[in-house]
Amino acid sequence: MNKRDFPRVHFYDQDFVDIYDKSWAWIADYWTVGDARKGFPKDKFFHYPPSRTLDQLDQVFASFFLVYSNRLYAASNGLDALYGKQEESGAIRGSYDLESGEPVLTKDNPEGLAAPLFAWAEYNLYHKTANKKRVKEVMPALHKYHQWV
């Protein structure tokens, strides 16, 4: 296997293998460049186009899948886009409108709180990449976020 290619799946059910391969092809179509004027970094991150929001859960779960792309896709850029939206209080809202950069708040969830899964995602990234520098860089944001929660 080429280290600069996606991991290959060898499985008896070719339909399963085809879905796996197609999912990597679809991901290539769903990269969004952040807009610095709206508070997002200029790095590309995964985003499913029908939704016009950047969602915490989507980015956390995307990081679990993208970490297996052999660095063809950055698994942490979506998380970094959310860290970039962190407020002085430590708040990182669960969803942000990509057009305005504003948090999406509802009557049922006026704080925009989502499940606090950032630390879990970062643990997984560290477990797969052993990037100690990243842990050191994101720890202050995670600490502030958990104080807010």
Q: What is the predicted function of each stretch?
A:
Residues 52-149:
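Aromatic-rich carbohydrate-recognition surfaces in CAZymes
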